Amino acid sequence: MGSPLCVPIFLAVCILIQSSTHGQSLRPEPFGRRARVTATKKTLLETETRFLLFKDKANKGCQIRLHHADTLQECGFNSSLPLVMIVHGWSVDGLLESWIWQMVAALKSQPARPVNVGLVDWISLAHSHYAVAVRNARLVGQEVAALLQWLEESAPFSRSNVHLIGYSLGAHVAGFAGSYISGKHKIGRITGLDAAGPLFEGTSASDRLSPDDATFVDAIHTFTREHMGLSVGIKQPVGHYDFYPNGGSFQPGCHFLELYKHIAQHGLNALSQTIKCAHERSVHLFIDSLLHPSMQSTAYQCSDMDSFSQGLCLGCTKGRCNTLGYHIRQEPLSKGKRLFLVTQAQSPFRVYHYQFKIQFINQIEKPLEPTFTMSLLGTKEEMQKIPITLGEGITSNKTYSFLITLNLDIGELMVIKFKWENSAVWANVWNTVQTIIPWGIKPRNSGLILKTIRVKAGETQQRMTFCSENMDDLQLHPTQEKNFVRCEVNPKKLKLKIK
């Protein structure tokens, strides 16, 4: 998108997007009918769409002109290197956004993997009513396809070495470009960064970015939260791998819950900044993968964010996890995969994912809803008092699974300090319950027992089981903290000891 002002206007377009103007539908024409473009439109596009190549990260871009081979040499095009082309999205103010230059600089700062870096500048055609820009997107896609085919004819260059990176509406431009490439082979890769939703959600594969448009298509979804049935970013999968950071609905640090306060302070611009933050997060996650090669974010295949939040999807066998961003493992699939991950609110965005499974025995008939914290001690670092939310009361004998994320690498986990954090008032209630228990029952059988803590580290795939440091006292009481260490005994023996 263009300036901060464009997002509220974008939402206004979303609200009206299914209406008609002067009796004409705003929905794009079907793929087959759009393929025939008049000579007048082609001539117009050739003057309005610019292809820029960047010699270095500080360069403002050198224009490559279709059918002018001399411009390839002037702009420093190296046919032996891959070509990465950035495609911007819809614009209201007609200005290119600052993230473009950040991505150019990040791509040019890869000494181990040098590439040609280009930009599809279609700002004059993107600077239109949204529905008009959608129609223009298909035409611009044709121009990009024409450029790539000309490059193959003009230089010893293969389309398989092309990587198109499209943001918002630009993601669909990239998809159209791939679909218009004629011949047996496809372009190498397309990355869709929060591909635009309005006028594309629910359409056929030929009318949007899809896995058919390149040998490998990956997509990052960061703002799929619906407003009146529409979302800024497309929700449906559009690639071989579709990544949904933090569920894809919204992003941490974008302060959506404080929107009304921001509007009171900053006016309508607060709305634009809040929504732009989540939509554009896809761009910054991708740039982050370039700037921090040693801190790549891993995502995991899962059915939905609720299951992922329970820690149920941290497996990597059979290709069930992959790296988000530029360094993704490229595996074209017959059936696409949806992957989830948690990120921080700012760069570097990487977190470390852990699944915890805790088995409780509650010997009080009434379900308990205590508050817990865990402190994790690793070989490198430790994390203190991480709050634990089970989401339901503790019943007689049940195992609870949940996800914990850490913003630093603690190394190999060695000790877990588990604490019942309830207040002194709760402790008094607990003591009262203990008092009214029939005298015939032993005190040690009248409480909450924590049997084992099982842990799986997503990033290392390591599995660990922790047992109480004091096997003679397994009871846990309010305000009490217990240490758990790696189990030295067989879990089956532990079960016998507890009975």
UniProtKB/Swiss-Prot annotation:
Residues 352-486 form the PLAT domain. It comes from the Eukaryota. InterPro entries: AB_hydrolase_fold, Lipase, Lipase_hep, Lipase_LIPH, Lipase_N, PLAT/LH2_dom, PLAT/LH2_dom_sf, TAG_lipase. GO terms for biological process: lipid catabolic process. The keyword Acyltransferase does not apply. Transmembrane segments: none annotated. PROSITE patterns: LIPASE_SER, PLAT. The active site is at 168 (nucleophile), 194 (charge relay system), 279 (charge relay system). Residues 254-277 are annotated as: Essential for determining substrate specificity. Residues 1-21 form the signal peptide. It is found in: Secreted. GO terms for molecular function: apolipoprotein binding; heparin binding; lipoprotein lipase activity; lysophospholipase activity; phospholipase A1 activity; triacylglycerol lipase activity. Glycans are attached at residues 78, 397. It catalyses: a triacylglycerol + H2O = a diacylglycerol + a fatty acid + H(+); a 1-acyl-sn-glycero-3-phosphocholine + H2O = sn-glycerol 3-phosphocholine + a fatty acid + H(+); a 1,2-diacyl-sn-glycero-3-phosphocholine + H2O = a 2-acyl-sn-glycero-3-phosphocholine + a fatty acid + H(+); 1,2,3-tri-(9Z-octadecenoyl)-glycerol + H2O = di-(9Z)-octadecenoylglycerol + (9Z)-octadecenoate + H(+). Its EC number is 3.1.1.3, 3.1.1.5, 3.1.1.32. Coiled coil: none annotated. Keywords: Glycoprotein, HDL, Heparin-binding, Hydrolase, Lipid degradation, Lipid metabolism, Secreted, Signal. One of its GO terms (cellular component) is high-density lipoprotein particle. Homodimer. Belongs to the AB hydrolase superfamily. Lipase family. Catalyzes the hydrolysis of triglycerides and phospholipids present in circulating plasma lipoproteins, including chylomicrons, intermediate density lipoproteins (IDL), low density lipoproteins (LDL) of large size and high density lipoproteins (HDL), releasing free fatty acids (FFA) and smaller lipoprotein particles. Also exhibits lysophospholipase activity. Can hydrolyze both neutral lipid and phospholipid substrates but shows a greater binding affinity for neutral lipid substrates than phospholipid substrates. This is Hepatic triacylglycerol lipase. It comes from Oryctolagus cuniculus (Rabbit). The gene is LIPC.
